[in-house]
């Protein structure tokens, strides 16, 4: 028995054939699938590049519940950890794509990965990581550190 496939089109013109059941993890794709004319010609995803869409599809295929190929929770956690071993720019692109496509599990995984990266860093390191300019005066910063002394211990 063959499974129904749909075509997803990235912002840079790449097309990907995906099993409909795996694609159903993306809420925006479900909305497009209800409009039959979109599925016939492919579903355009103007906010996702081909490189990132390929990764999203890989994630959805792995997380798709497939009775024929069950995956234990431990195996899936290990796979997720290895999947997120990417440069920070790619992780941020995955966060944006997961948010746009409304894939909560991928969004949560990518955000948790960023949280683990910055965990234990100083405020200065976190500002540098996110490219945030420090707009506090030295006096304001000192007052905040005094008020929240427990957080800096």
Curated annotation (Swiss-Prot):
One of its GO terms (biological process) is auxin-activated signaling pathway. InterPro entries: SKP1, SKP1-like, SKP1-like_dim_sf, SKP1/BTB/POZ_sf, Skp1_comp_dimer, Skp1_comp_POZ. Residues 95-153 are annotated as: Interaction with the F-box domain of F-box proteins. Pfam families: Skp1, Skp1_POZ. Disulfide bonds: none annotated. Pathway: Protein modification; protein ubiquitination. Keywords: Nucleus, Ubl conjugation pathway. The keyword Nucleus applies. GO terms for cellular component: nucleus; SCF ubiquitin ligase complex. Expressed in leaves, shoot apical meristem (SAM), roots, flowers and pollen. It comes from the Eukaryota. It is found in: Nucleus. Involved in ubiquitination and subsequent proteasomal degradation of target proteins. Together with CUL1, RBX1 and a F-box protein, it forms a SCF E3 ubiquitin ligase complex. The functional specificity of this complex depends on the type of F-box protein. In the SCF complex, it serves as an adapter that links the F-box protein to CUL1. Part of a SCF (SKP1-cullin-F-box) protein ligase complex. Interacts with CPR1/CPR30 and At3g61590. Belongs to the SKP1 family. This is SKP1-like protein 9. It comes from Arabidopsis thaliana. The gene is ASK9.
């Amino acid at each position: 028995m063959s499974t129904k496939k749909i075509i997803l089109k990235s912002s840079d013109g790449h097309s990907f054939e995906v099993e409909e059941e795996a694609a159903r993890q993306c809420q925006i794709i479900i909305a497009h699938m209800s409009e039959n004319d979109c599925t016939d010609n492919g579903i355009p995803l103007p906010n996702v590049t081909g490189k990132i869409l390929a990764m999203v599809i890989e994630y959805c295929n792995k997380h798709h519940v497939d009775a024929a190929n069950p995956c234990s929770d431990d195996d899936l956690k290990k796979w997720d950890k290895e999947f997120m071993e990417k440069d920070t720019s790619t992780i941020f692109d995955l966060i944006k794509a997961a948010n746009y496509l409304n894939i909560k599990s991928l969004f949560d995984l990518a955000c948790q990965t960023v949280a683990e990266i910055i965990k234990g860093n100083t405020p200065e390191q976190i500002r540098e990581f996110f490219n945030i300019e420090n707009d506090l005066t030295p006096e304001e910063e000192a007052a905040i550190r005094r008020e929240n002394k427990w957080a800096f211990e």
